[in-house]
Amino acid sequence: RLLLFTHHSGEPHGILGAQAAATFLERRLSIPSIVVGIERDYAPENLFRFIKDHYRDQEKVAAFSHLCGRKDLFELARELKRDGFTTVLGGPQAREDYRGEPDAGSRPNRFQGLRSSFDIAFQGPVNHLKPDHLKIPGMLVESPWTRDLFLEVDWSNLYLFSDNLKKLDVRLAQVLNAIGCPHAKKSHTATLPPPDHLRDRGIPEMEVRSKGCIFCDVAWDKGYHGLLDRSRVLSQIEGLPESEGRKIPFELIDEFPIRSLGPLIEDVARHGVRLSQINLVCRVDDINAHSSELSDLLSLAMHHDVKILFASIGFESFADRMLSYLCKGITVDDIVRCVETLRRLKLRFVEHLLYRRDEGANHGFIRPTPWDDGEMLREIDTTIFL
């Protein structure tokens, strides 16, 4: 079997992209494959021994995706390449990760790319991957994002490696509802001053063009291609594992999910499928735009006994100046309104509305930053204590 290596935290969550890729390789290209999630605290000697034994009688092709910037995984790929493996890098950021930053050759402080670790890079969804692509060193294959994606997932193909290989029982999955983010369609120009500790050195401000949020890889990698057909979303949900007669919790991948949530819950119920929990990763402005509808939505969720977890809301900062630097498209007043809405609704939907850290949420907050002067820190702290 081909091994597809990824980063993994060790928690019982699936990895949609990598697991869908392994499923595609097996079901469409007849290349048996599994995903091996490597935990941060692992035994390198044991891993190399496992890889050597696994590939003893088969073609030495190893794939990598979702590496989360881990240098130890880059080095693993480099070592395998030196040992005669064909190493393949896949995923939404494969192009930039493989090539490096623009003008990196003349600017040594820029990211130089991962050509020394990988023979082949495949950018984008797996649909257009062909067996020949795995045989041409130096190739960068780019697959466009469209709504016609391969979305079959064998949720049982994920294993973990720490000291040895062990199968992971996935208890949290992902379901794709939209490709990219509508905010990514918006171009912005951010005027950035020099970092706080360099302000007295005569360094001028600089302008940076951004698509969507200035730090967001989704904006550059995917842009926005709209919602998937509902039938394709339902097929993904129907394919999820079950626990105690209900589908396991899943993240609904959609930066603006609230518009779809009510109709989706109703459609799933009509198909005789019982849900347990839906996790949302969304923007502040989506919550504010639908604040008057959330009560009815949560009543519907409560009727079907489905918990709604706002797992990650992109606050990023509680200072207006920083929000403008990040091209967030929101203000501190917007954030306060969002939080007040959730606090008010929590009084009614105690068990079915979840958004606190002790309920599993982990909201976006970027700090420290190079611009954290006294004025900004005071504004952030004042907002936090509201």
Named regions from a protein language model:
Residues 29, 35-40, 217-220, 365-367:
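Residue-level recognition of beta-strand->loop/alpha-helix junctions
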